[in-house]
Amino acid sequence: MTRFSSLLASALLLLLPVASAGAAAPAALFEAKTVADRDSTLTALEAAPTDPASAYAAGAGQFFTALEILAGGLHRHGFESPQSFILPLMRLPVPDNPNPEPLTYDGFRAILVAFRDRLEKSAATLGSVPADADIGMEVDLTRLGIDLNEDGQIAPDESAAAIMASLSRGGAPDPAGPALTFRFDRADGYWLQGYAEFLMAQADFWLAHDFS
């Protein structure tokens, strides 16, 4: 797997089955099929900030939902995702929208503000995890995803594996293929926090300009 795919895997890290996060977390997050189910468990994890594993998972989930906010906003108004090589994690394969809503200047800014604010929350949550926290989480990238088209569902073609396949070769993963399981630790949390702050700076750049 390419370095880019590995980085994307880190960025799309969903809230994983961790013993201290509670027994309900694996079913609600790792196997979440709807945004409502995932968000319900994310809210519960956010309410347990003193637990390092819960904070780590919540911070990753907040980053994950920031990407979803951006993808949903682009899809709602019929835009393609930015193709800049400088921002690979913003190059989400947003589905075509045959009935896009008109986009106003204020609406464009609102998407950026929501994206930026969610990233800020993610960076702060990840930063709260102690440096010596012993965290090891495993995830199958074929079983997690984000809602790219705002239909409230997390479909197989919206999985991390499908997104990575689309970005790397314009294809789709083999449904009968093996699981794509990765293990993430505290060091990956530092990287994710840094990338959240980098993307925040990009959003701030756009928000600092008046294009009306």
Question: Model-predicted segments: where are they?
Answer:
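Positively charged n-region of N-terminal signal peptides that target proteins for export
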Residues: 1-5
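Bacterial N-terminal signal peptides
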Residues: 9-18
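Sec/Tat signal peptide C-region and signal peptidase I cleavage site
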Residues: 19-23
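Solenoid-like repeat scaffolds
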Residues: 45-49
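Residue-level recognition of tetratricopeptide repeat
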Residues: 51-54
